[in-house]
Amino acid sequence: MKSQDIRKQFLEFFKSKSHTIVPSAPMVLKDDPTLMFTNAGMVQFKEFFLGNSVAKSNRVTDTQKCLRVSGKHNDLEEVGHDTYHHTMFEMLGNWSFGDYFKEEAISWAWELLTEVYKISPENLYVSVFEGSDDRDDLGLDTEALELWKKIVPEERIIYGNKKDNFWEMGDQGPCGPCSEIHIDIRSEEEKAKTPGRDLVNMDHPQVVEIWNLVFMQYNRKANGDLEELPAKHIDTGMGFERLCMVLQNTQSNYDTDVFTPLVGEIEEITGVTYGKSEENNIAMRVIADHVRAVAFSIADGQLPSNTGAGYVIRRILRRAIRYGFTFLNTKEPFIYKLVPVLSGQMGATFQELKSQQNLIENVIREEEASFLRTLDQGLILLENLMKESKDKTISGEKAFELYDTFGFPIDLTALILKENGYDLDEKGFEAELKKQKDRSREATAVSAGDWIELNPVDEESFVGYDKLEADAKIARYRKVESKKKGEMFQVVLNKTPFYPEGGGQVGDKGILMSSDGEVVDVVDTKKENNQIIHFTKNLPKNTEAEFKAIVNKTERYNTASNHTATHLLHQALRSILGTHVEQKGSMVQSGYLRFDFSHFSKVTGEELEKVENFVNARIREQLSLDEQRNISYQEAIDQGAIALFGEKYGDSVRAIRFGDSMELCGGIHVKNTSDIWHFKISGESAVASGIRRIEAITGEAAMKYFEEQTNILEEIKSGLKNSNDPVKAINNLQEENINLKRQIESLLKDKAKNLKSKLKHEVKSINGVNFLSKKVDLDAAGIKDLAFQLGEEIDDLFILFGAEQHGKALLSCYISKELVKGKDLNAGQIVRELGKYIQGGGGGQPFFATAGGKNPDGLNEALQKAESFIK
């Protein structure tokens, strides 16, 4: 059975059980402070489990793309080394929100596996929660046990502990016991030796969990206590790749048609055959898995970067590159070539892979090229560390510096050291890594208290599109603490005009004012699990009072101006550069706007001018806002609205139109484009391969910019001889400056020529080396030029020049190439050693290197010590 058919049968089965099929949510999460990636099928339904929203359908099913690489669900290090862990995977699931419970969940799971997929019951085992004797004091899940007894023999029921059979969303929130279904796909001979039940949850590659049925019936409070949920829910998840392994009768997920096209392409590109060597097998599995994770992340809008979710994606891709580099001998970018195979294989189910294919290929290719350069640099640095080591051991601190500063993988460091007979201080490295993780954890740790319910509401009313003020009451609040922001309060109102951060737009600020005049500042607004959360530094004295919720008008108007400008900018770019342009990210706040978009070359000055003129023309046209709320998604698309990639849209959406610009958008906008006043581009740059960024200002910021430019112009004119024609006056100054530079260069050349003749007579021979150590009055470029000229005329030459420039010290070392080879001299090592005398450091090539320092008084001692390197 093909994987596409397996997926389809699952969804159709639950559709026949009155479930609504819903699309996968994005794998990359944008508005969830607790998660960077969707790591389970239930993530997109958290708001229903938490009771913050009411589901439109109380029975749903889907296939959800997931990523597990960090935190509690961290499968990264296992990936490739076994045959059933993955970073990116599909989770097939069915959910009940307060509708059916254990009986239906269990019976339907068994029906699908044994009657639809025709899996032999003889190969299946099930587990139930055995209870716990800790502070929760939970008993055996007798309800699930009795239900399973009606279906399977008792010897196939396993009693599981809290670790395996009690599922929790996190430190707080809905949770409950679960039943896992495991399958034994070993040979009959192996089954006869060891019963399958003895291998359940023992990390056996052929006795694996395929389905987890979670019975959400409790809520974990901030103090650790459990309480019964008012409504009970079902949350199930089945690993699609593992199911394919079972139904396609293979011994590995990587032998299914989910992975074989990718593995085959890797074989074709590298010339290495899968199955001949375990090292090669692991490398191929790592690459086949990781390209999926990276491609889906980029398709969902997350580019590789040095922070947050982007860093996780970069780390996954670099792990794949490193395995190819080390075990498949790939020294050129090649992983990007797998993207068309992946797109052809999964693009029908996940359309974003097809629509974003060019971008994915370009980003991966550029990342590969960049990291391969890093690997080359790291190899040189590691080689130098080995040469400097006297006891054939590289310290954990140095290895961590290679890893942290230069991005050089620690396991590659360990492998190279081992091959060269060196040891790595692994404990020292782990200690440094732990310090870094502790610092990061401490900086980002947030502790949250329980919600205090005052005036419970099913769903908060947002009135911010029409009003900047609203009468409100506090529905609930809780205290949160973090090292970065200290103690704060999260407040949920029954009605609010405050727009929460989302869609690239920052959250509103403002105040809550009680009837007796007390004012509480709202410093930020965010959305979490479908709740609009207002962040305050303190609570009002009377939390039961009625309040005026008032948004900061100035910040709101400026932000709205910038947001509308991004829509006009998007239209301008598509009109001038081409319809290939797609928005890839944005930041809209009161002071400026930032807009990222797909385009594969630098935007020229002429093109930027056209873009700016296009937007300002729309501003002068005084286009009115045409807003459609609660329009169906399909109707909006049919009208020509642009939907942004990586965004999750519901059945009904909000469409924003200004003239011919129409986009799906939940943000705040001006009523008329004339309110923007003016649009001015302040910068254009590259974000990643195929992604450009434009920064711009509007309104008050643009007005202030023009005032500053006018003042600068007046200041320039006042300092010129011809203030009536400043351009001509500046051209004259530039021409005069060029002539003076030429004269100075000519004088310096004469000086260096005379100095070279003089220095040739000061060279002395020591142990077969022509040696010169001298303080000179030249800049860095002049010193380098002089050293190489002397090197061309004198063989076996060792030079150390010192110079003082602008109160700083400079050392430059030149060594003839024959000395580098014959005497094992290294200019880079020498300047690093001598740099301590000038309170500085440096490096470079073995034949030429420089060091800078803040202590010119140490130059003479450094110059004197140079001779010791050849004695």
UniProtKB/Swiss-Prot annotation:
Keywords: Aminoacyl-tRNA synthetase, ATP-binding, Cytoplasm, Ligase, Metal-binding, Nucleotide-binding, Protein biosynthesis, RNA-binding, tRNA-binding, Zinc. One of its GO terms (cellular component) is cytoplasm. Consists of three domains; the N-terminal catalytic domain, the editing domain and the C-terminal C-Ala domain. The editing domain removes incorrectly charged amino acids, while the C-Ala domain, along with tRNA(Ala), serves as a bridge to cooperatively bring together the editing and aminoacylation centers thus stimulating deacylation of misacylated tRNAs. Zn(2+) binds at H563, H567, C665, H669. SMART domains: tRNA_SAD. It is found in: Cytoplasm. Its EC number is 6.1.1.7. NCBIfam families: alaS. One of its GO terms (molecular function) is ATP binding. PANTHER family: ALANINE--TRNA LIGASE, CYTOPLASMIC, ALANYL-TRNA SYNTHETASE. Its cofactor is Zn(2+). The gene is alaS. Belongs to the class-II aminoacyl-tRNA synthetase family. It catalyses: tRNA(Ala) + L-alanine + ATP = L-alanyl-tRNA(Ala) + AMP + diphosphate. Binds 1 zinc ion per subunit. One of its GO terms (biological process) is alanyl-tRNA aminoacylation. It is an enzyme of class 6 (ligase). This is Alanine--tRNA ligase. Catalyzes the attachment of alanine to tRNA(Ala) in a two-step reaction: alanine is first activated by ATP to form Ala-AMP and then transferred to the acceptor end of tRNA(Ala). Also edits incorrectly charged Ser-tRNA(Ala) and Gly-tRNA(Ala) via its editing domain.
